């Protein structure tokens, strides 16, 4: 009897098998959209497109890259999506700033009768209603959730409250809160924030004092309410209660306390808050740093404001704007303009309309007519920023301060090209002349040479 032939050795050069676990792993570790498409191609090649888990991963990962159109293509290939997959697609569209598409998909889900709603469907849809300001549809979804038996879900109720408060329906928000059989800390905080945002401070105080448990978000919401309503003393009193309860503040708490210090006009209190933040390990980031600059400037310590600015590692546009404006307000016009040039050239930060309010204010406060006209033109021609009332007011102040009107007129004539200016500037200026019964001759010469239609 012949001996059996030995089995052939495995091919060590053959690629490893590509099954669902491998595909799932590659999707979890995918780092860009190009990789995702390659993985999807392999999924199709190996006939894995009916794997619901892989399809959901494809939708989730493509949405995380902002590729909702690709996610929709994947979703549309499914014959009978599960409720989970419908929910995922609705959520993906909503979080990627396409709420109307999310709502259309929800309507399609309703009329298709292929899938049943669950308790996660309605919160996602309500968030899409909020993002698109569709309060009418939100009310209809509210009724549909009641009929479907999901109204008592706390997550849904919290989302619904948020919708009503943010869409200016505080009474409806309170009704939802009052009907809740059980309330989480999120429920109480949503209610508190809703009342604060709708300027119902007295009601917010009652809710805050009734809360069975308070976290840093709750305390900060109430402190914010006092600051927003210009009641800084009560903001600090509440912060002391917060310390007694041993609740550590967050960055938003600190920034609100800095604003309260500004409202009090108390440099010493502002310094105390700054020192507290430093001792408790708060990082001097753009948010906190800008608030400190604003506080120090408005409380009269430009030197401290500049110190904070100089030690900041990262600076946002708001940070630059705050420092430039502070310098201009305090009469340091040349330093403000120098800082603006530094922002453009070294920091590569593009200015906005607020930046030029600070720049033009600096020119106006120091009577710098030449640079004022130059920056005004540059704002329009280089950055395409249309003049707003504050810009016009600065230019009126600047030209009124000019001792040599003819010289200012010559500067106007020396502009290289015709900017598309807002006509309100010339009108406001000449109207101001008429109100003061000032002799219009020289001023009118200036605006005749630089046609007021160009403003």
UniProtKB/Swiss-Prot annotation:
Question: What is the annotated localization of this protein?
Answer: Plastid, Chloroplast
Q: Where is the transit peptide?
A: 1-19
Which GO BP annotation is one of this protein's? RNA modification
Q: Which UniProt keywords apply?
A: Chloroplast, Plastid, Repeat, Transit peptide
Q: What is its main location?
A: plastid
Start-end of the PPR repeats?
Answer: 51-81, 82-117, 118-152, 153-187, 188-214, 215-249, 250-284, 285-315, 316-350, 352-387, 388-418
Q: Which GO terms describe its cellular component?
A: chloroplast
GO molecular function list: mRNA binding
Keyword Ribonucleoprotein applies: no
Concerning PROSITE patterns, the annotation shows: PPR
Source organism, top-level taxon: Eukaryota
- Cite the InterPro entries for this sequence: Pentatricopeptide_rpt (IPR002885), PPR_At4g14850-like_plant (IPR046960), TPR-like_helical_dom_sf (IPR011990)
Family, according to the entry, reads as follows: Belongs to the PPR family. PCMP-A subfamily.
Mind telling me what this protein is named?
Answer: Pentatricopeptide repeat-containing protein At3g26630, chloroplastic
Q: Give the source lineage, highest ranks first.
A: Eukaryota, Viridiplantae, Streptophyta, Embryophyta, Tracheophyta
